[in-house]
Protein backbone atom coordinates (compact mmCIF):
# COMPACT_ATOMS: atom_id res chain seq x y z
CA UNK A 1 0.00 0.00 0.00
CA UNK A 2 1.24 3.50 -0.78
CA UNK A 3 1.91 6.47 1.44
CA UNK A 4 -1.17 8.12 -0.10
CA UNK A 5 -3.41 5.41 1.34
CA UNK A 6 -1.90 4.68 4.74
CA UNK A 7 -1.88 7.32 7.46
CA UNK A 8 0.89 5.99 9.65
CA UNK A 9 0.51 8.54 12.43
CA UNK A 10 -3.08 7.37 12.99
CA UNK A 11 -1.85 3.79 13.27
CA UNK A 12 0.84 4.85 15.73
CA UNK A 13 -1.87 6.64 17.74
CA UNK A 14 -3.66 3.33 18.27
CA UNK A 15 -0.62 1.57 19.72
CA UNK A 16 -1.79 1.98 23.30
CA UNK A 17 -4.54 -0.45 24.28
CA UNK A 18 -7.85 1.41 24.51
CA UNK A 19 -9.03 -0.84 27.35
CA UNK A 20 -5.79 -0.72 29.32
CA UNK A 21 -3.52 2.28 28.85
CA UNK A 22 -0.67 0.47 30.60
CA UNK A 23 -0.29 -1.95 27.67
CA UNK A 24 0.38 -1.78 23.96
CA UNK A 25 -2.19 -3.10 21.51
CA UNK A 26 -0.74 -6.37 20.18
CA UNK A 27 -2.95 -6.34 17.07
CA UNK A 28 -1.82 -2.88 15.96
CA UNK A 29 1.79 -3.69 16.84
CA UNK A 30 1.66 -6.89 14.76
CA UNK A 31 0.20 -4.98 11.82
CA UNK A 32 2.88 -2.29 12.00
CA UNK A 33 5.60 -4.92 12.16
CA UNK A 34 4.87 -5.86 8.55
CA UNK A 35 4.72 -2.24 7.39
CA UNK A 36 8.46 -1.63 7.79
CA UNK A 37 11.50 -3.54 6.46
CA UNK A 38 14.55 -4.79 8.36
CA UNK A 39 12.51 -5.30 11.55
CA UNK A 40 12.51 -1.52 11.91
CA UNK A 41 9.32 -1.44 13.96
CA UNK A 42 10.56 -4.04 16.45
CA UNK A 43 13.84 -2.15 16.82
CA UNK A 44 11.97 1.13 17.31
CA UNK A 45 9.74 -0.31 20.05
CA UNK A 46 12.78 -1.89 21.71
CA UNK A 47 14.44 1.51 21.63
CA UNK A 48 11.39 3.15 23.22
CA UNK A 49 11.60 0.60 26.03
CA UNK A 50 15.39 0.76 26.44
CA UNK A 51 15.67 3.87 28.65
CA UNK A 52 18.21 5.19 26.12
CA UNK A 53 16.00 7.92 24.62
CA UNK A 54 16.10 11.50 25.90
CA UNK A 55 14.27 14.71 25.08
CA UNK A 56 16.16 17.80 26.23
CA UNK A 57 14.24 21.06 26.43
CA UNK A 58 15.80 24.49 26.78
CA UNK A 59 13.39 25.65 29.43
CA UNK A 60 13.07 29.02 31.10
CA UNK A 61 9.37 28.85 31.94
CA UNK A 62 8.31 25.48 33.31
CA UNK A 63 11.29 24.73 35.52
CA UNK A 64 9.47 25.53 38.76
CA UNK A 65 9.00 23.86 42.09
CA UNK A 66 6.31 21.21 42.09
CA UNK A 67 5.51 18.65 39.44
CA UNK A 68 8.22 19.61 36.96
CA UNK A 69 8.01 16.37 34.96
CA UNK A 70 4.31 16.75 34.28
CA UNK A 71 4.76 20.36 33.18
CA UNK A 72 7.47 19.32 30.71
CA UNK A 73 5.14 16.72 29.21
CA UNK A 74 2.54 19.46 28.85
CA UNK A 75 5.12 21.51 26.94
CA UNK A 76 5.61 18.61 24.51
CA UNK A 77 1.86 18.13 24.16
CA UNK A 78 1.44 21.82 23.31
CA UNK A 79 4.26 21.69 20.77
CA UNK A 80 3.55 18.41 18.99
CA UNK A 81 -0.15 17.70 19.48
CA UNK A 82 -2.07 20.87 20.18
CA UNK A 83 -0.03 23.39 18.23
CA UNK A 84 -0.71 25.87 21.01
CA UNK A 85 2.87 26.68 21.95
CA UNK A 86 3.26 30.46 22.26
CA UNK A 87 6.93 30.41 21.28
CA UNK A 88 9.27 28.23 19.27
CA UNK A 89 10.29 25.32 21.47
CA UNK A 90 13.99 24.57 21.51
CA UNK A 91 14.52 20.87 22.03
CA UNK A 92 16.89 18.07 21.11
CA UNK A 93 16.11 14.40 20.59
CA UNK A 94 19.00 12.27 21.76
CA UNK A 95 19.66 8.53 21.86
CA UNK A 96 22.43 7.05 23.96
CA UNK A 97 24.71 4.98 21.73
CA UNK A 98 25.21 1.48 23.12
CA UNK A 99 28.76 1.35 21.73
CA UNK A 100 31.34 2.30 24.36
CA UNK A 101 32.87 5.70 23.77
CA UNK A 102 30.54 6.59 20.90
CA UNK A 103 28.94 10.06 20.96
CA UNK A 104 25.18 10.39 21.51
CA UNK A 105 22.95 10.04 18.46
CA UNK A 106 21.13 13.20 17.37
CA UNK A 107 17.66 12.73 15.86
CA UNK A 108 15.72 15.43 14.01
CA UNK A 109 12.25 14.31 12.91
CA UNK A 110 11.37 17.84 11.74
CA UNK A 111 13.99 17.58 8.97
CA UNK A 112 14.16 13.76 8.82
CA UNK A 113 17.78 13.42 9.84
CA UNK A 114 19.70 11.13 12.17
CA UNK A 115 23.41 11.01 12.92
CA UNK A 116 23.47 7.20 13.17
CA UNK A 117 25.38 4.89 10.80
CA UNK A 118 22.19 3.32 9.44
CA UNK A 119 20.80 6.65 8.26
CA UNK A 120 24.14 7.65 6.69
CA UNK A 121 24.36 4.30 4.92
CA UNK A 122 20.97 4.58 3.24
CA UNK A 123 21.46 8.26 2.46
CA UNK A 124 24.69 7.51 0.59
CA UNK A 125 23.01 4.62 -1.22
CA UNK A 126 20.22 6.95 -2.36
CA UNK A 127 22.84 9.48 -3.43
CA UNK A 128 24.71 6.89 -5.51
CA UNK A 129 21.50 5.79 -7.24
CA UNK A 130 20.56 9.35 -8.15
CA UNK A 131 20.97 10.21 -11.81
CA UNK A 132 23.09 13.27 -12.57
CA UNK A 133 20.05 14.94 -14.12
CA UNK A 134 17.90 14.27 -11.05
CA UNK A 135 17.61 16.62 -8.13
CA UNK A 136 18.13 14.92 -4.77
CA UNK A 137 15.08 16.82 -3.52
CA UNK A 138 12.90 15.09 -6.12
CA UNK A 139 14.35 11.69 -5.27
CA UNK A 140 13.85 11.90 -1.52
CA UNK A 141 10.88 14.22 -1.02
CA UNK A 142 7.28 13.87 -2.14
CA UNK A 143 5.72 17.27 -2.78
CA UNK A 144 1.94 17.65 -2.80
CA UNK A 145 0.45 20.91 -4.08
CA UNK A 146 -3.09 19.71 -4.79
CA UNK A 147 -5.27 20.42 -1.76
CA UNK A 148 -7.51 17.51 -2.69
CA UNK A 149 -4.53 15.20 -2.23
CA UNK A 150 -3.54 16.61 1.17
CA UNK A 151 -3.16 14.06 3.96
CA UNK A 152 -3.63 14.22 7.72
CA UNK A 153 -0.63 11.94 8.16
CA UNK A 154 2.19 13.53 10.15
CA UNK A 155 4.76 10.75 9.79
CA UNK A 156 7.87 11.93 7.91
CA UNK A 157 6.13 15.24 7.17
CA UNK A 158 8.34 18.27 6.60
CA UNK A 159 7.19 21.82 7.40
CA UNK A 160 3.73 20.82 8.66
CA UNK A 161 2.73 24.48 9.10
CA UNK A 162 2.60 25.24 5.37
CA UNK A 163 -0.93 25.84 4.07
CA UNK A 164 -0.12 25.81 0.35
CA UNK A 165 1.86 22.57 0.01
CA UNK A 166 2.73 19.37 1.82
CA UNK A 167 6.13 17.73 1.82
CA UNK A 168 6.85 14.19 2.93
CA UNK A 169 10.25 12.56 3.13
CA UNK A 170 10.25 9.23 1.28
CA UNK A 171 10.95 7.17 4.38
CA UNK A 172 10.90 3.95 2.36
CA UNK A 173 14.26 5.10 0.96
CA UNK A 174 15.82 6.34 4.21
CA UNK A 175 14.67 5.44 7.70
CA UNK A 176 16.26 4.16 10.89
CA UNK A 177 14.99 2.87 14.21
CA UNK A 178 15.75 6.20 15.91
CA UNK A 179 13.63 8.26 13.52
CA UNK A 180 10.81 5.73 13.69
CA UNK A 181 10.91 5.57 17.50
CA UNK A 182 10.72 9.34 17.95
CA UNK A 183 8.01 9.56 15.27
CA UNK A 184 5.94 7.03 17.18
CA UNK A 185 6.45 9.14 20.30
CA UNK A 186 5.86 12.62 18.86
CA UNK A 187 3.78 12.09 15.71
CA UNK A 188 1.03 9.83 17.05
CA UNK A 189 -1.13 10.75 20.04
CA UNK A 190 -0.95 12.20 23.53
CA UNK A 191 -1.71 8.75 24.96
CA UNK A 192 1.31 7.23 23.23
CA UNK A 193 3.56 10.09 24.37
CA UNK A 194 2.43 9.69 27.98
CA UNK A 195 2.65 5.90 27.80
CA UNK A 196 6.41 5.98 27.23
CA UNK A 197 7.28 9.14 29.19
CA UNK A 198 4.96 8.90 32.19
CA UNK A 199 3.34 5.47 32.52
CA UNK A 200 6.36 3.31 31.74
CA UNK A 201 8.88 6.13 32.33
CA UNK A 202 11.22 4.74 29.67
CA UNK A 203 11.78 7.94 27.68
CA UNK A 204 13.26 10.76 29.73
CA UNK A 205 12.28 14.41 29.34
CA UNK A 206 14.91 16.71 30.81
CA UNK A 207 14.81 20.48 31.23
CA UNK A 208 17.96 22.55 30.79
CA UNK A 209 17.63 26.13 32.02
CA UNK A 210 21.29 27.06 31.77
CA UNK A 211 22.62 28.15 28.37
CA UNK A 212 26.11 26.81 29.15
CA UNK A 213 24.70 23.35 29.84
CA UNK A 214 22.69 23.61 26.62
CA UNK A 215 25.85 24.40 24.64
CA UNK A 216 27.73 21.56 26.36
CA UNK A 217 25.00 19.19 25.21
CA UNK A 218 25.76 20.12 21.61
CA UNK A 219 29.52 19.83 22.14
CA UNK A 220 29.09 16.29 23.49
CA UNK A 221 27.07 15.35 20.40
CA UNK A 222 29.75 16.67 18.04
CA UNK A 223 32.52 14.91 19.93
From Swiss-Prot:
Transmembrane segments: none annotated. The keyword Cell membrane does not apply. It comes from the Eukaryota. GO terms for biological process: DNA recombination; DNA repair. Keywords: DNA damage, DNA recombination, DNA repair, Nucleus. Signal peptide: none annotated. It is found in: Nucleus. GO terms for cellular component: nucleus. The keyword DNA damage applies. Plays a role in a RAD51/RAD54-dependent homologous recombination repair (HRR) pathway to repair MMS-induced lesions during S-phase. Required for error-free repair of spontaneous and induced DNA lesions to protect the genome from mutation. Belongs to the SHU2 family. Component of the SHU complex composed of at least CSM2, PSY3, SHU1 and SHU2. This is Suppressor of hydroxyurea sensitivity protein 2. It comes from Saccharomyces cerevisiae (strain YJM789).
Amino acid sequence: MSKDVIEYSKLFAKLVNTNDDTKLDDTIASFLYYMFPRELFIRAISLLESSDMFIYILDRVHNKEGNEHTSLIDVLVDEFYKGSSNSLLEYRLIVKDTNDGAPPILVDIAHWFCSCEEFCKYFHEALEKTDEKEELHDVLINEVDDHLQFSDDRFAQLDPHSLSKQWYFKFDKICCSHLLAFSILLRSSINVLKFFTVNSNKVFVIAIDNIDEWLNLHINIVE
